[in-house]
């Protein structure tokens, strides 16, 4: 306990005039009032720093241009996302008398079409914290699994528990279609009615609430202190394949359209039938109306074609083949994939139904032995991968 003669080294108040005096090294002291002021200054500084970072948000065209560098195809989805993200952060920064709702996003598209990569790249462009959650692991209270608040734990962890930064982060929830409740319209859903409970629990944090977040995760550490996190300005992007949704849309179009088959054929020619999705279709699929209402921006991603996959292998800044070329260049060896090799890799990804996600696994399998041998190779100038996905070694000319 501080003695009566002690004074604060910052404000010079006596220990008699403040609730608490904290003794430091070399006779230095600080009173509890100065500690509170210091904490307020730190919070204000953090707010200003985060606001500065977000204030430099690029315009929609600039966002799409950067997305184009990393993601092949999906032009319409990239436009929709660029506008939604720009409006979301503009809404945070520029206070208005008009109540502008949050532009949470729903991405619908097959496995490997780029949903996760789009969300991750957006967070990178905007320099905001980012977290990914898998909806299939989430359960409502009373069931075995993760609490929905664990989604927020990951976001806090990814920004070193800086609450101000976390408040303006992006959370991507994958496989959101798997928590749809069972319905007669969508018999493919196997999850029981607890899926609706998870939707209700997620609804609160998605629409904006002061959430009590267990910093070490919920159920394994029941006695920890909670962190309060306001989710009002966190952007939520939900994604899923929604297998069976196409049939629901077809049924709706069939009921409302004369010449049903002609109308369906027209949509098939123009593109993805899923692009005709409406909120009622998602409700019939098994999402509750309130949940659908909190995801006002819906974007549909197309299945990637063989040509798209070939471009993904070679064109983006972080293309997997570019990465291997650079690794072999460091060994003084060139690397070339023939057009036939690229096409065979793309065909295999389509056959596996893994889309862009499966390309890396296929290329890594081809390259494993090459990367094992490369550091020991002598006089090899170039390695060419042909349509049989086998390496051909080109040696340096003697002399």
Swiss-Prot record:
BP-aspect Gene Ontology terms: cell division; proteolysis involved in protein catabolic process
SUPFAM superfamilies: Glucocorticoid receptor-like (DNA-binding domain), P-loop containing nucleoside triphosphate hydrolases
GO MF entries: ATP binding; ATP hydrolysis activity; ATP-dependent protein folding chaperone; protein dimerization activity; unfolded protein binding; zinc ion binding
Keywords: ATP-binding, Chaperone, Metal-binding, Nucleotide-binding, Zinc
Positions with a binding annotation for ATP: 110-117
Keyword ATP-binding attached: yes
Pfam families: AAA_2, ClpB_D2-small, zf-C4_ClpX
Record's GO cellular component terms: HslUV protease complex
Residues that bind Zn(2+): 8, 11, 31, 34
Domain ClpX-type ZB stretches: 1-50
Family matches, as PROSITE patterns: CLPX_ZB
Metal-binding in keyword set: yes
Function noted in UniProt: ATP-dependent specificity component of the Clp protease. It directs the protease to specific substrates. Can perform chaperone functions in the absence of ClpP.
Family membership: Belongs to the ClpX chaperone family.
Subunit composition and interactions: Component of the ClpX-ClpP complex. Forms a hexameric ring that, in the presence of ATP, binds to fourteen ClpP subunits assembled into a disk-like structure with a central cavity, resembling the structure of eukaryotic proteasomes.
Classification via NCBIfam families: clpX, PRK05342.1
HAMAP family per UniProt: ClpX (MF_00175)
Protein name: ATP-dependent Clp protease ATP-binding subunit ClpX
Organism encoding this protein: Hydrogenobaculum sp. (strain Y04AAS1)
GN (gene name): clpX
């Amino acid at each position: 306990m501080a003695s009566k003669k002690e004074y604060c080294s910052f404000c010079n108040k006596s220990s008699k005039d403040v609730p608490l005096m904290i003794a430091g090294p070399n006779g230095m002291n600080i009173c509890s009032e100065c500690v509170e002021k210091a904490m307020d200054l730190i919070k204000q500084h953090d707010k200003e720093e985060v606001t500065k970072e977000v204030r430099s948000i690029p315009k929609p065209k600039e966002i799409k241009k950067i997305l184009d560098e990393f993601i092949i195809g999906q032009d319409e989805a990239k436009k929709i996302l660029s506008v939604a993200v720009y409006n979301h952060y503009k809404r945070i920064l520029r206070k208005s008398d008009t109540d502008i709702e949050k532009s949470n996003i729903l991405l619908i598209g097959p496995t490997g079409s780029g949903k996760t990569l789009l969300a991750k790249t957006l967070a990178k462009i905007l320099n905001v914290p980012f977290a990914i959650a898998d909806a299939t692991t989430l359960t409502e209270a009373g069931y075995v699994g993760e609490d929905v608040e664990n989604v927020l734990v990951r976001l806090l962890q990814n920004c070193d528990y800086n609450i101000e930064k976390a408040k303006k982060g992006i959370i991507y929830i994958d496989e959101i279609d798997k928590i749809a409740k069972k319905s007669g319209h969508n018999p493919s859903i196997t999850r029981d009615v607890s899926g609706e409970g998870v939707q209700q629990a997620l609804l609160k944090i998605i629409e904006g609430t002061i959430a009590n977040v267990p910093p070490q995760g919920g159920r394994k550490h029941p006695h920890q202190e909670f962190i309060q996190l306001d989710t009002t300005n966190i952007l939520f992007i939900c994604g899923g394949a929604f297998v069976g949704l196409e049939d629901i849309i077809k049924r709706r179009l069939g009921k409302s359209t004369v010449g049903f088959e002609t109308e369906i054929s027209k949509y098939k020619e123009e593109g993805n039938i899923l692009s005709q999705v409406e909120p009622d279709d998602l409700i019939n699929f098994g999402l509750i109306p309130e949940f659908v209402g909190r995801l006002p921006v819906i974007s549909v991603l197309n299945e990637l074609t063989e040509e798209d996959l070939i471009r993904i292998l070679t064109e983006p800044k972080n293309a997997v083949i570019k990465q291997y070329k650079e690794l072999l260049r460091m060994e003084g060896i060139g690397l070339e994939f023939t057009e036939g090799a690229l096409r065979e890799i793309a065909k295999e990804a389509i056959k596996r139904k893994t889309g862009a996600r499966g390309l890396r696994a296929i290329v890594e399998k081809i390259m494993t032995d090459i990367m094992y041998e490369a550091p020991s190779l002598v006089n090899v100038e170039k390695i060419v991968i042909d349509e049989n996905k086998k390496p051909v070694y080109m040696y340096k000319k003697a002399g």
